[in-house]
């Protein structure tokens, strides 16, 4: 049985700012773009969250909820430095590390000899070491599979951890709401509830054929997760090849103005996700995806070295006009393909 730890730093960007400037510790702060530039919140500290300020929220809305919010532009060099230090701490316990972003990672400690092989004690020690060396807090989840470790890391935030032992998995899944499973959004959750499926226990009683017919390949993933099955390895060589964001509408849209409005809402989230993965990364291409009411989908990409909203909107409009054919649109997505690190290195060396 595997021993997987998911470590998630607590409001990471904001925590670095509060550590480096103690005057910020007890006041609402957020990292994000300005209201004038239609920016979006990247991270908010817990005092700000008490006012309802959340990640991916438009800055203007955040300032309405919390007029005295202190808005910071972000210091990504400082965040990267802290992230690299945290990664080095992880490496003291295992070489099997899969970073998901600057502030979270999976660790496979199945074969680790530290702490007598106890994943629970390893997680506690890692969190304490991070605090001792960086004055930052982390939350952790421990479980025999990746998706449960990720869910567990959110159970006792901030600065806590939650353990799901192999023996506890069946009971934990029985009452686990389906929206806790990564990949189940509001639209999927609503469709599942319409089928009478609210928990993993409900899905366990459902015929796999029905799920496949209703949700395609995601139906199988949903069924497997509800059984506690997740065979994905912690991949130390994992390379993030793309970053994307998409929205499935509750009802199909038929007018370009509706599509453009969705892109306007998606774009700040794409910016936020890209910054979280690697703020200074060059991109190779950016593109759009439309999925139609007959479940056919089309993707259009352009070579573009930096994220550009105007180009994405123009690409989406061209795709809408040329490929929709009168069909309703049920999903709109934006994505960027990241530059191969070796190519990026060559470009840097060539300057």
Curated annotation (Swiss-Prot):
Recorded catalytic reaction(s): these are: DNA(n) + a 2'-deoxyribonucleoside 5'-triphosphate = DNA(n+1) + diphosphate
Q: Which Gene3D superfamilies match?
A: 3.30.70.270, 3.40.1170.60, 5' to 3' exonuclease, C-terminal subdomain, DNA polymerase, Y-family, little finger domain
The cellular component terms of Gene Ontology attached to this UniProt record, alphabetical and capped at eight, are: cytosol
- Database matches in Pfam families: IMS (PF00817), IMS_C (PF11799), IMS_HHH_1 (PF21999)
Task: Name the Enzyme Commission number(s) assigned to this protein.
Answer: 2.7.7.7
According to its UniProt entry, what is the function of this protein? Poorly processive, error-prone DNA polymerase involved in untargeted mutagenesis. Copies undamaged DNA at stalled replication forks, which arise in vivo from mismatched or misaligned primer ends. These misaligned primers can be extended by PolIV. Exhibits no 3'-5' exonuclease (proofreading) activity. May be involved in translesional synthesis, in conjunction with the beta clamp from PolIII.
Primary location group: cytoplasm
Stated name of the protein: DNA polymerase IV
Q: Where is the active site?
A: 104
Cofactor(s) annotated in UniProt: Mg(2+)
Q: NCBIfam families, from UniProt?
A: PRK02406.1 (NF002677)
Q: How does it assemble?
A: Monomer.
Give disulfide pairs as residue numbers: none
Biological process terms from the Gene Ontology for this record are:
DNA-templated DNA replication; error-prone translesion synthesis; SOS response
């Amino acid at each position: 049985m595997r021993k997987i730890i998911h470590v998630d730093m607590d409001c990471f960007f904001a925590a670095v700012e509060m550590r480096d400037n103690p005057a910020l510790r007890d006041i609402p702060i957020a990292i994000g773009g300005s209201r004038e530039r239609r920016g979006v919140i990247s991270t908010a500290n817990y005092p700000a969250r008490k006012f309802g300020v959340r990640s991916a929220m438009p800055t203007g809305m955040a300032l309405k909820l919390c007029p005295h919010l202190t808005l910071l532009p972000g210091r990504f060099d400082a965040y990267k430095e802290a992230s690299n230090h945290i990664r080095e701490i992880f490496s003291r316990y295992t070489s099997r590390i899969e970073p998901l972003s600057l502030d979270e990672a999976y660790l496979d400690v199945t074969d680790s000899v530290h702490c007598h092989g106890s994943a629970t004690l390893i997680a506690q020690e890692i969190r304490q070491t991070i605090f001792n060396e960086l004055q930052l807090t982390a939350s952790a989840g421990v479980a025999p599979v990746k998706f449960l470790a990720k869910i567990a890391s959110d159970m006792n935030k901030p600065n806590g951890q939650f353990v799901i032992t192999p023996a506890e998995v069946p009971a934990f899944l029985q009452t686990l709401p389906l929206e806790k499973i990564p990949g189940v959004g509001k639209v999927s959750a609503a469709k599942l509830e319409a089928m009478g499926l609210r928990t993993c226990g409900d899905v366990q009683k459902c015929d796999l054929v029905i799920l496949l017919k209703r949700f395609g390949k995601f139906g199988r993933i949903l069924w497997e997760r509800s059984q506690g099955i997740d065979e994905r390895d912690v991949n130390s060589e994992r390379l993030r090849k793309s970053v994307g964001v998409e929205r499935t509408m509750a009802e199909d849209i038929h007018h370009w103005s509706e599509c453009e409005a969705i892109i306007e809402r998606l774009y700040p989230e794409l910016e936020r996700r890209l910054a979280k993965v690697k703020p200074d990364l060059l991109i190779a291409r950016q593109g759009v995806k439309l999925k139609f009411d007959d479940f056919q989908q089309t993707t259009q990409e352009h070579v573009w070295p930096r994220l550009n909203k105007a180009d994405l909107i123009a690409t989406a409009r061209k795709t809408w006009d040329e490929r929709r054919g009168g069909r309703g649109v049920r999903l709109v997505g934006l994505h960027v393909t990241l530059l191969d690190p070796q190519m990026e290195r060559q470009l840097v060396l060539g300057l």
